[in-house]
């Protein structure tokens, strides 16, 4: 079975085309060796699970690793201290039973199983002593990993559990405990506390203030993407300018792992489908090797971008939900996109911090910006579609769209000329405040109807509306 590009769940090096993350793993190992407790909080589908899995695989000979996940735990697991501790015992026993860790004595195995049973009543002190026993008996430093901590975001028992881990960290010089504890999820633990506490005075009173800052860059650089494409090119005999294609993918994705892999996946699928449906599009002969090969070029990547922007997936669905849940974040993005507002970047501003944490916003030269072209265009499409059915200008653009595009080139001068005529007819009597607030949005609705289905667009600044080429 040959390798594939993958966007669903874990990636395995022997099954999937992947970016080489050894340098990230070594940076994480440094944190572990230094005895740090930390949180890998990154946006959805940012490679957290794969990183944790490869971390456990790569360093299992140096550390005894217990890796559990709170994904899928029901509310009954958090209803009281006993229920929560029983569940943690159960998750630990699964790790032992399936031999995902080594060097576990019969005493620990038996005790772990006994405390996971429904009639057991373990509390946090019992669990803390059990952790100490594991660490005391282990011949290697013990690392404790908890994935999907967001699943416990609204549960007081989880924060009490963090408090117990903090207490063990503070007493690490006198009592056996973990070398390192790694939590993983979208939210920082400080934000988990914020979601639970209702009183403003305790919003940031997190028991996880012992955590070291996690500074590892998990996005993909053009060099990272090029390395993955090189492996693919060698395996499949694809003809492409690797550096140029890698840079183009990066330009649209900002190195967001899911977006990078999805564009590659869509490009590969389209090439395979095209070769099967059309003789003329079948793989051509590679003159150097004499074998048959595909070819990737700029238009293939842009077609994949267009397809990605038009599909429903869990990442975009989650984006819509997050924006619906946070009106402050939604308003900031609207101001940036449609008003061109320059908002100073401040990590202390809750809505900005939330947008960065979700992967939608970034700090660009001290100002808040949308993190990549894919997200920016998807957000434009989302907002522009809200009232498009009621917009008369959109109708006029749709009816006359053929006159604006010749051989893939957008006649921007004609677009502006016709727009001003129609805009004056429809909105000429509007107040200046309306025009200032909504003018850019109205123009983008007009422009979108013209290029819809013909090309892609992205907007770097208001001045870029003068560009003539469709991409």
What function would you assign to each model-found segment?
Residues 60-75:
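Conserved catalytic segments around the Walker B and adjacent sensor/switch elements
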């Amino acid at each position: 079975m040959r390798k594939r590009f993958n966007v669903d769940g874990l990636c395995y090096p022997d099954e999937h085309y992947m970016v080489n993350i050894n340098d990230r793993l070594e940076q994480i190992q440094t944190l572990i060796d230094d005895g740090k407790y930390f949180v890998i909080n990154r946006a959805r589908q940012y490679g957290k699970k794969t990183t944790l899995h490869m971390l456990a695989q790569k360093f299992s000979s140096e550390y005894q690793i217990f890796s559990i996940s709170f994904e899928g735990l029901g509310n009954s697991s958090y209803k009281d201290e006993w229920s929560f501790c029983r569940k943690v015992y159960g998750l630990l026993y699964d790790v032992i039973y399936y031999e995902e860790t080594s060097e576990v004595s019969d005493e620990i195995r038996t005790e772990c199983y006994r405390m996971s049973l429904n009639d057991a009543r373990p509390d946090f002190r019992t669990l803390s002593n059990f952790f100490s026993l594991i660490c005391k008996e282990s011949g290697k430093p013990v690392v404790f990993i908890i994935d999907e901590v967001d699943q416990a975001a609204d549960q007081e028992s989880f924060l009490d559990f963090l408090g117990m881990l903090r207490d063990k960290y503070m007493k690490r010089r006198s009592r056996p405990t973990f070398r390192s504890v790694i939590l993983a999820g979208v939210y920082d633990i400080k934000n988990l506390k914020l979601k639970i506490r209702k009183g403003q005075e305790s919003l940031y009173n997190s028991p996880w203030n012992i955590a070291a800052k996690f500074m590892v860059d998990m996005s993909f650089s053009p060099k990272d993407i090029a390395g993955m494409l090189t492996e693919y090119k060698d395996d499949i005999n694809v003809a492409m300018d690797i550096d140029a294609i890698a840079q183009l993918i990066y330009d649209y994705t900002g190195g967001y792992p899911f977006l990078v892999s999805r564009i590659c996946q869509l490009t590969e699928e389209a090439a395979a489908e095209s070769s099967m449906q059309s003789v003329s599009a079948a793989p051509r002969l590679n003159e150097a090797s004499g074998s048959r090969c595909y070819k990737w070029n700029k238009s293939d990547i842009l077609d994949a971008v267009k397809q990605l922007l038009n599909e429903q997936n869990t990442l975009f669905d989650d984006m819509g939900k997050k924006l619906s849940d946070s009106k402050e974040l939604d308003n900031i993005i609207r101001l940036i996109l449609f008003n061109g507002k320059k908002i100073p970047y401040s990590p202390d501003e809750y809505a900005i911090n939330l947008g960065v944490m979700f992967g939608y916003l970034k700090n660009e030269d001290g100002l808040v910006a949308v993190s990549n072209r894919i997200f920016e265009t998807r957000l434009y499409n989302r907002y522009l579609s809200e009232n498009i059915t009621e917009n008369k200008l959109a109708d006029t653009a749709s009816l006359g769209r053929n006159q604006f595009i010749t051989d893939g080139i957008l006649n921007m001068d004609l677009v502006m000329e016709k727009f001003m005529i129609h805009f004056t007819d429809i909105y000429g009597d509007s107040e200046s405040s309306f025009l200032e607030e909504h003018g850019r949005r109205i123009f983008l609705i007009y422009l979108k109807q013209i290029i819809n289905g013909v090309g892609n667009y992205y907007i770097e600044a208001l001045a870029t509306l003068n560009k003539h080429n469709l991409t």
